[in-house]
C-alpha cells in the first residue's frame, strides 16, 4: 500500500494497475491450486492470498527500484531536516487516522440503524451502499489524479495551474455524478435487478430510489476536495471537515422530522456528504496561497 501511494504521488498509475492485476491473478490461481489440486481445503485460501501479497510486494519493489534508478537525488538531507520531515509525516498520519475513525463511526451507525428498521430495509440499504461504492470507485480515480497533480503544482508554487486543475476535476466530477444520478434514479429497477434476484427487494428499493440517486450529487465535491487536500497535505482541514460533517450527521438524524427512520438516516447521510464538500470548499477559498 505504501508503494502504491508513492507510485500515484509520482504520477505513475500504470505500475499500481499492473501490481493489482498480478495480485488478483496470482490469488485466483494459487487458491485454486491449493484448494483443489493439493486438496488443502479452506486452508488453501489464505495461503493463496499470502502468496499473492508476497508477489505484489516483490513486483512493487521491482517497479520502485526501476523508477528510482531514473530519478536524480539533488542532495542528501541533513538530520534536522529528516526529523522535521518525520514529524510532519506522523502529523499527517494522525489526522488521516482520526478522520478515518469519523468515517467508520458514520458507516457503522448507518448499518446498525438500518438493521433495526427490519430485514428489508437492511437489504435495500446494503444494496444502495454497493451502488454508492461503485460510484466512489470511479470518483477515486479523479481524487488520485488530484492528489498527484495538485501536489505537483503546489510544490512548484504554480497557483494558476493548480486552480485550473481543480476546475477541470470538478467539471469531470459533475459530469460523472450526473450520469450516475440519472442511472440510479431513472433506471433504478434495472440497476437493482443486477444486484438482487429478489423481486420484493427490488420493489421495496423503488420507494427510496431518489435517496441513492442524490448520493452522487451530494458526495461529488467531497471526493474531489479530498484528493485536492491530500495533494496539498492539508490533512488538518480534512479532519476538521469530517468531524464537523459527522456532528451534523448525528444531529440531522436525531432531529429529523421524518416519521420514517430510514428516510431520516438517508437525509443525515446525504447532508453529511454535502457538508464535507462545503467545508473543504470554504477552507480552499480562504487560503490565499492556493
Model-derived features: positions:
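Short loop-to-helix capping motifs
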Residues: 12-13, 41, 119, 198, ...
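Hydrophobic alpha-helical transmembrane segments in multi-pass integral membrane proteins
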Residues: 249-255
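Generic structural marker for isolated residues within well-ordered, non-membrane alpha-helices
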Residues: 4, 31, 110, 188, ...
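Hydrophobic faces of transmembrane alpha-helices in multi-pass small-molecule transporters and flippases
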Residues: 10, 14-21, 59-62, 78-109, ...
